[in-house]
Amino acid sequence: MTEASESCVRDPSNYRDRSADWYAFYDERRRKEIIDIIDEHPEIVEEHAANPFGYRKHPSPYLQRVHNYFRMQPTFGKYYIYSEREWDAYRIATIREFGELPELGDERFKTEEEAMHAVFLRRIEDVRAELA
């Protein structure tokens, strides 16, 4: 038997996918990078508060990097805006596993923009907490 054939995976069920290990490694590096960006450029928090939808003015490169990181996160556990009454009352909800109802936060917001910025701030807090 040749050396190449001995190292082949014959039964895929015996193969452990190591991509999760690398994802965790690089995700921790990205979290540190994101917090460094926020600490070195605190003006991006004010920029987001003034324009949470991003349609008034194109976001700065630093804010774009933070947004890109938040958007690439797994769906379960993400925050979204729940509208209690259209154009009037908004809350933050958390996406949960299939078949589970979303978890609604207690805090209420008058505008969707206020709620969007609150989600942004909460995501920053979560990243800081994960690094602590």
Curated annotation (Swiss-Prot):
<protein>
    <recommendedName>
        <fullName>N,N-dimethylformamidase alpha subunit</fullName>
        <ecNumber>3.5.1.56</ecNumber>
    </recommendedName>
</protein>
<keyword id="KW-0378">Hydrolase</keyword>
<comment type="subunit">
    <text>Heterotetramer of two DmfA1 (alpha) and two DmfA2 (beta) subunits.</text>
</comment>
<dbReference type="GO" id="GO:0050116">
    <property type="term" value="F:N,N-dimethylformamidase activity"/>
</dbReference>
<comment type="function">
    <text>Hydrolyzes N,N-dimethylformamide, and to a lesser extent N,N-dimethylacetamide and N,N-diethylacetamide. Has no activity against the substituted amides N-methylformamide, N-ethylformamide, N-ethylformamide and N-methylacetamide or the unsubstituted amides formamide, nicotinamide, acetoamide, benzamide, acetamide and acrylamide.</text>
</comment>
